[in-house]
């Protein structure tokens, strides 16, 4: 599963909802408070005093919210535009201005964002919204073009680097993503999104402890619904199977995403209790004649109600329809089943999954982790393939 592509779809929903989007995000923290009664006189124009500029930006953000809530939208737009002048590196002002403008024009839709961004290519807020839309559509080249245009004018904008990193992870281009993430964390060391992205980088390099630390730090700063899956799957990679099972048992979402949680929890419990006792974690299989979205058929396979050939056939058909690499996922879960039941060539299947899966898939991370663990436990003088064949 690719958590970041799924999250990118949620980014689009965020852009299309003023309440959930930038205009209603938490107010930027201010070191120097400025009351509504006093900031108008103090905040005529930006100065060389960065702290004062920041305080004015915070006051203008709050003033814009008051005006918007009262229905005085022109005043809200003016306050957001002024706030952007005081804090141009904080792209929330430009994005909130673009979002509110589109909403008032009844154009806060994908087509409206496309048209507005094309008509005003120099608008940073519209460019960022269009980049979100492009990531959701998997048009990463368009997203990067938008973000690079913003960075050309605002090179110290953390949100732009963060958007670029998200696109690079989703492509995936991990070398570029590492550079982007380093830039974000230089500008904003407590960025939850970038900590999560760095966690993925660390998992891919085998630094599971570092990845877990990043994921847990991000969760402490800004909890996300998918955090238990990301943290639990990382604990699995560390061979912390008890911790993984406990983490994955919390707040499981509905299918199809929740099915991945159940699959990984089962894999962890099966290492501790065996497949028979752990099978309850999978939940019920698919009723006869009922089609369910992927990865539902994996549950049927692990229950033994369908065979590997049937699972692969379903995966191929699903991949043809959705183009999200279900075949590589099938090979990973087949490999785990072979490993747990001590039959077949689990190592060959893990190698196949590692070669097929995009690097931003959890199944890729899982396959690589299993291959490393097998190599570490192989008897001296044998290869992983030798150890597998001896089973």
Task: Label the predicted regions.
Residues 49, 83, 115-116, 149-150, ...:
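Canonical positions in the second alpha-helix
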Residues 62, 96, 129, 163, ...:
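Canonical tetratricopeptide repeat
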Residues 52, 86, 119-120, 153, ...:
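Structural marker of alpha-solenoid helical repeat scaffolds
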Residues 71, 104-105, 138, 172, ...:
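Residue-level detector of the short coil/turn that links helix A to helix B
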Residues 68, 102, 135, 169, ...:
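Position-specific recognition of the canonical hydrophobic site in helix A of tetratricopeptide repeat
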Residues 98-102, 128-132, 165-170, 193, ...:
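Alpha-helical adaptor scaffolds
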Residues 50, 57, 91-92, 124-125, ...:
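Helix-start (N-cap) detector for alpha-helical repeat units in TPR-like alpha-solenoids
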């Amino acid at each position: 599963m690719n958590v970041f592509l799924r999250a990118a779809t949620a980014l689009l929903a965020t852009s299309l909802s003023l309440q959930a989007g930038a205009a209603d995000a938490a107010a930027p923290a201010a070191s120097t408070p400025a009351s509504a009664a006093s900031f108008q006189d103090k905040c005529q124009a930006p100065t060389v005093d960065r702290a004062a500029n920041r305080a004015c930006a915070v006051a203008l953000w709050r003033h814009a919210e008051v005006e918007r809530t009262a229905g005085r939208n022109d005043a809200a737009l003016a306050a957001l535009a002024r706030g952007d002048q005081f804090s141009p590196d904080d792209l929330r002002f430009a994005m909130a201005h673009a979002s509110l403008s589109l909403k008032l024009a009844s154009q806060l839709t994908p087509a409206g964002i496309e048209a507005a961004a094309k008509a005003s290519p120099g608008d940073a807020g519209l460019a960022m919204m269009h980049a979100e839309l492009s990531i959701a559509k998997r048009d990463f080249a368009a997203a990067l073009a938008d973000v690079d245009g913003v960075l050309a004018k605002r090179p110290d904008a953390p949100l732009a680097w963060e958007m670029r990193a998200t696109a690079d992870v989703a492509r995936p281009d991990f070398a570029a993503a590492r550079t982007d993430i380093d830039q974000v964390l230089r500008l904003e060391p407590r960025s939850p999104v970038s900590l999560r992205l760095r966690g993925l980088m660390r998992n891919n390099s085998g630094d599971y402890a570092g990845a877990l630390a990043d994921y847990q730090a991000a969760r402490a700063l800004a909890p996300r619904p998918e955090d238990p899956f990301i943290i639990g799957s990382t604990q699995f990679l560390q061979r912390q199977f008890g911790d993984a099972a406990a983490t994955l048992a919390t707040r499981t979402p509905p299918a199809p995403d929740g099915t991945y949680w159940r699959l990984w929890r089962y894999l962890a419990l099966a290492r501790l209790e065996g497949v028979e006792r752990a099978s309850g974690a999978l939940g019920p299989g698919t009723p006869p004649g009922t089609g369910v979205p992927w990865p539902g058929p994996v549950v049927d396979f692990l229950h033994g109600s369908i065979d590997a050939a049937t699972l692969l056939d379903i995966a191929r058909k699903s991949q043809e329809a959705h183009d999200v690499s279900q075949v590589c996922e099938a090979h990973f879960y087949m490999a785990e089943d072979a490993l747990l039941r001590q039959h077949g060539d689990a190592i060959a299947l893990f190698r196949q999954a590692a070669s097929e899966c995009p690097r931003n898939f959890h199944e890729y991370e899982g396959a690589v982790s299993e291959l490393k663990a097998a190599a570490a436990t192989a008897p001296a003088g044998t290869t992983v393939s030798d150890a597998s064949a001896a089973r």
